[in-house]
Every structure is written in structure tokens, then in C-alpha cells.
């Protein structure tokens, strides 16, 4: 009798995706982040579901409903902080996952990579709308500032902003629709993840060498299930340390003040994971230019397959490209730091230099470095 795992229509799909999947034997811990992102998404959907049971999306009661969750609901404080800090863990895993893709040339799988970039946009949109829901000062002013950026779009900008707001300012209609979108988007993300995996399994996984590994594949289970469980335990450990010891470490104190349209906080800034893009936005004095730079700072990831000039796929044997990659990482850290600083000297000029360097490295320096390495290979 054949195994049900290999014959049952539903279980067969799971088997081909997570059990009998042929996997390169040499993939390192950098390949753990896909499964960790799946775990993060599951944690966010579950904690979010329980939060939604007690949350009210009304401007009069939103802030107090979050307070009620933390004070009166059984383990409400735990659920709330797991959700808030779970978002941070989600983005840490996302950035490492994307960084791995860039370093090892995984972007040469066009469909998988482009769906991944769309997923990144979807997660960023979800996180932004989620930050608005507690209706604190930073929630309100963050929503006002970021949605207002759309007014830079010629001709339709102002109408578009008022349409998104559902009025002439960020108010009850805005909060209600943001809650609705924040609830539905994770399920759309989950569907996109399925498509992401579908395209990945069409080609098989990349590996650190960047070479074809068809001759050396091993089953996903038990080898990589065990490896993933280690990653899962470390992620949960990190998340729980954050939640139980310093839950407000990554938050903004201003968000513990209820939203007040008449009082602007001294420094309006988004959550830490958006600061690099926010720094790029602020470094351009023109509103439309800033918005375009902001969008392009993420959209530029889609150009990586076109900008790949090297004869080798991975950076593992390319020391010059490695050097440029780590300069890019350092530049992103610099942008993140600048995004959280006030708009004054010397932060303005540092932000502008870091922004120019960011686009220069990706569009010019890395392709040029690859061409130089190709020449060196001939020697």
C-alpha cells in the first residue's frame, strides 16, 4: 500500500513542499529566515485576531480600548506586546532574508524575487496601518504626515488624500478603514506567500555557492525541519526576552499620549524599521522628489536582476562585491540612525550623503565592481 502522504491530494502538496522537497545539502543558517517569516506571520495573525476581539476602531474609544486590553483582559498585555514587538522581529527577519537574497544572488529567480518585493510592500503597508490603530500622538501624526505625501502627486493628489482620509483630516473614517485594511492584508500576504513558495519550488532553492546543486540534494525532512526548529526556538527566545523585559524598547513614548490634532509632537518619526526610507524621503527638499525617492528606495530591489553584471551568481567568491555589499549595509544603518534624528545640521547633510550613496552603490558601483571582477577573472 502506498503512503497516504504521497497519494492524498492535500497531504501530497504539503509533502512536496515541506517533507520530500529536494533541498541543497549546503544551505546555511541564512536560509532559515523564510520559515521564521512564516512563523512571524502566524504569530501576528493569531495575536492580532485576539486583539481585534477587544479593540474598537473609533476615535473616542480606540486609545482606551488598547489600555483596557493591557489592564483588564487576561494576558492582554502579553498579546499586545507580542503583536507590537512581533512586527519588529518580522522586519528584522525580512531585512536579513532580503540581504541574504542580495548576497547570494537569489534575485536571479525573477518571479520569486518580484513577488518577494511585492510582499515587502504589503508588509510595510500593514505595519504602517497597524501603527495608527492605538490612536496615540505618533499614530495620529504619523498617519497625517505619511498619507499627506500623496498630495504631491500632480493633479489628483489632494483629491486622493481626502478620499483616503474619508474627510478633510485624519479622523474616525480613516481609523475605521485602516483597521479594516490592517485586518485583511495579512491574509492577502499569506496568499502571496503561497505564490512565492510556488515559484520557488519550480526552480528549487539557491545555495551559498550559487552553483547548480541538482547532483547533491537531500530531503527537507528531517534535516532542515530540525534546523528550522532551532531557528524557531531562537526567534521565540529573542521575542519573549524583548516582550517580557523591555516591551517599549522599540516604541515611541509619544504614543502613550492620546491623539490630539491641536498639539504636534516635536519630532514626528515612524517605527524604527521605516527610518531608512524616512531618511531618504527627508533628504530631498522637494515634496514630489522625496516621495519618488521613498518609493524607489524599495522598488529598486526589482532592478537587481537587471543590474547583475557578474559571471558568477553568488558573492561568496567575489571579495570586491562583498566589500560593496557591506558598505551598503553600513549605509542602511546610517540612514536608520539619521531617520530618527531631528532635521538640523549635521544630520541633514549626513542623510543626503547616505541617500546618494545608497542609490549610487546599487545603480552604479555594484554593477561596475562586477564588471571589474569579470575582467580580473580573465587574468
Curated annotation (Swiss-Prot):
<dbReference type="GO" id="GO:0045275">
    <property type="term" value="C:respiratory chain complex III"/>
</dbReference>
<dbReference type="InterPro" id="IPR048259">
    <property type="entry name" value="Cytochrome_b_N_euk/bac"/>
</dbReference>
<dbReference type="InterPro" id="IPR016174">
    <property type="entry name" value="Di-haem_cyt_TM"/>
</dbReference>
<feature type="binding site">
    <location>
        <position position="201"/>
    </location>
    <ligand>
        <name>a ubiquinone</name>
    </ligand>
</feature>
<dbReference type="GO" id="GO:0005743">
    <property type="term" value="C:mitochondrial inner membrane"/>
</dbReference>
<feature type="transmembrane region" description="Helical">
    <location>
        <begin position="288"/>
        <end position="308"/>
    </location>
</feature>
<dbReference type="InterPro" id="IPR048260">
    <property type="entry name" value="Cytochrome_b_C_euk/bac"/>
</dbReference>
<protein>
    <recommendedName>
        <fullName>Cytochrome b</fullName>
    </recommendedName>
</protein>
<feature type="binding site" description="axial binding residue">
    <location>
        <position position="196"/>
    </location>
    <ligand>
        <name>heme b b566</name>
    </ligand>
</feature>
<keyword id="KW-1133">Transmembrane helix</keyword>
<feature type="binding site" description="axial binding residue">
    <location>
        <position position="83"/>
    </location>
    <ligand>
        <name>heme b b562</name>
    </ligand>
</feature>
<keyword id="KW-0830">Ubiquinone</keyword>
<keyword id="KW-0349">Heme</keyword>
<feature type="transmembrane region" description="Helical">
    <location>
        <begin position="178"/>
        <end position="198"/>
    </location>
</feature>
<dbReference type="InterPro" id="IPR030689">
    <property type="entry name" value="Cytochrome_b"/>
</dbReference>
<feature type="transmembrane region" description="Helical">
    <location>
        <begin position="113"/>
        <end position="133"/>
    </location>
</feature>
<keyword id="KW-0999">Mitochondrion inner membrane</keyword>
<dbReference type="InterPro" id="IPR027387">
    <property type="entry name" value="Cytb/b6-like_sf"/>
</dbReference>
<feature type="transmembrane region" description="Helical">
    <location>
        <begin position="320"/>
        <end position="340"/>
    </location>
</feature>
<feature type="transmembrane region" description="Helical">
    <location>
        <begin position="33"/>
        <end position="53"/>
    </location>
</feature>
<dbReference type="GO" id="GO:0008121">
    <property type="term" value="F:ubiquinol-cytochrome-c reductase activity"/>
</dbReference>
<comment type="subunit">
    <text>The cytochrome bc1 complex contains 11 subunits: 3 respiratory subunits (MT-CYB, CYC1 and UQCRFS1), 2 core proteins (UQCRC1 and UQCRC2) and 6 low-molecular weight proteins (UQCRH/QCR6, UQCRB/QCR7, UQCRQ/QCR8, UQCR10/QCR9, UQCR11/QCR10 and a cleavage product of UQCRFS1). This cytochrome bc1 complex then forms a dimer.</text>
</comment>
<comment type="function">
    <text>Component of the ubiquinol-cytochrome c reductase complex (complex III or cytochrome b-c1 complex) that is part of the mitochondrial respiratory chain. The b-c1 complex mediates electron transfer from ubiquinol to cytochrome c. Contributes to the generation of a proton gradient across the mitochondrial membrane that is then used for ATP synthesis.</text>
</comment>
<feature type="transmembrane region" description="Helical">
    <location>
        <begin position="77"/>
        <end position="98"/>
    </location>
</feature>
<keyword id="KW-0408">Iron</keyword>
<dbReference type="InterPro" id="IPR005798">
    <property type="entry name" value="Cyt_b/b6_C"/>
</dbReference>
<dbReference type="InterPro" id="IPR036150">
    <property type="entry name" value="Cyt_b/b6_C_sf"/>
</dbReference>
<dbReference type="GO" id="GO:0006122">
    <property type="term" value="P:mitochondrial electron transport, ubiquinol to cytochrome c"/>
</dbReference>
<keyword id="KW-0813">Transport</keyword>
<dbReference type="GO" id="GO:0046872">
    <property type="term" value="F:metal ion binding"/>
</dbReference>
<dbReference type="Pfam" id="PF00032">
    <property type="entry name" value="Cytochrom_B_C"/>
</dbReference>
<keyword id="KW-0249">Electron transport</keyword>
<feature type="transmembrane region" description="Helical">
    <location>
        <begin position="226"/>
        <end position="246"/>
    </location>
</feature>
<keyword id="KW-0679">Respiratory chain</keyword>
<comment type="similarity">
    <text>Belongs to the cytochrome b family.</text>
</comment>
<dbReference type="Pfam" id="PF00033">
    <property type="entry name" value="Cytochrome_B"/>
</dbReference>
<keyword id="KW-0479">Metal-binding</keyword>
<keyword id="KW-0812">Transmembrane</keyword>
<dbReference type="InterPro" id="IPR005797">
    <property type="entry name" value="Cyt_b/b6_N"/>
</dbReference>
<feature type="transmembrane region" description="Helical">
    <location>
        <begin position="347"/>
        <end position="367"/>
    </location>
</feature>
<feature type="binding site" description="axial binding residue">
    <location>
        <position position="97"/>
    </location>
    <ligand>
        <name>heme b b566</name>
    </ligand>
</feature>
<keyword id="KW-0496">Mitochondrion</keyword>
Amino acid at each position: 500500500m502506498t503512503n497516504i502522504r504521497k497519494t492524498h491530494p492535500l497531504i501530497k502538496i504539503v509533502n512536496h513542499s515541506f517533507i520530500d522537497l529536494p533541498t541543497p545539502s549546503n544551505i546555511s543558517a541564512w536560509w532559515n529566515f523564510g520559515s521564521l517569516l512564516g512563523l512571524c506571520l502566524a504569530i501576528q495573525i493569531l495575536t492580532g485576531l485576539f486583539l481585534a476581539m477587544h479593540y474598537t476602531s473609533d476615535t473616542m474609544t480606540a486609545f482606551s480600548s488598547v489600555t483596557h486590553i493591557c489592564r483588564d483582559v487576561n494576558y492582554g498585555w502579553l498579546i499586545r506586546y507580542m503583536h507590537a514587538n512581533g512586527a519588529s522581529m518580522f522586519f528584522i527577519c525580512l531585512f536579513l532574508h532580503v540581504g541574504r537574497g542580495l548576497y547570494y544572488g537569489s534575485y536571479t529567480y525573477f518571479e520569486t524575487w518580484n513577488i518577494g518585493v511585492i510582499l515587502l510592500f504589503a508588509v510595510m503597508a500593514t505595519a504602517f496601518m497597524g501603527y495608527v490603530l492605538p490612536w496615540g500622538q505618533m499614530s495620529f501624526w504619523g498617519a497625517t504626515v505619511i498619507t499627506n505625501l500623496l498630495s504631491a502627486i500632480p493633479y489628483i493628489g489632494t483629491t486622493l488624500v481626502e478620499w483616503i482620509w474619508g474627510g478633510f483630516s485624519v479622523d474616525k473614517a480613516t481609523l475605521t478603514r485602516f483597521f479594516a485594511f490592517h485586518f485583511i492584508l495579512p491574509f492577502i500576504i499569506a496568499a502571496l506567500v503561497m505564490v512565492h513558495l510556488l515559484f520557488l519550488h519550480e526552480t528549487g532553492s539557491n545555495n551559498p555557492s550559487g552553483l547548480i546543486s541538482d547532483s547533491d540534494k537531500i530531503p527537507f525532512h528531517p534535516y532542515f525541519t530540525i534546523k528550522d526548529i532551532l531557528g524557531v526556538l531562537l526567534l521565540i527566545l529573542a521575542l519573549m526576552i524583548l516582550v517580557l523585559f523591555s516591551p517599549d524598547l522599540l516604541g515611541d513614548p509619544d504614543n502613550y499620549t492620546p491623539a490630539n490634532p491641536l498639539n504636534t509632537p516635536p519630532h514626528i518619526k515612524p517605527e524604527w524599521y521605516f527610518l531608512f526610507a524616512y531618511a531618504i524621503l527627508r533628504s530631498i527638499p522637494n515634496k514630489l522628489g522625496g516621495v519618488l525617492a521613498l518609493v524607489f528606495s524599495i522598488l529598486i530591489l526589482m532592478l537587481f536582476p537587471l543590474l547583475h553584471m557578474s559571471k558568477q551568481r553568488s558573492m561568496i567568491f567575489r571579495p570586491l562585491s562583498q566589500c560593496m555589499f557591506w558598505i551598503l549595509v553600513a549605509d542602511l544603518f546610517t540612514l536608520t540612525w539619521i531617520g530618527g534624528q531631528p532635521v538640523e545640521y549635521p544630520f541633514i547633510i549626513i542623510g543626503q550623503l547616505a541617500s546618494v550613496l545608497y542609490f549610487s552603490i546599487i545603480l552604479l558601483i555594484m554593477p561596475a565592481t562586477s564588471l571589474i571582477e569579470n575582467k580580473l577573472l580573465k587574468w
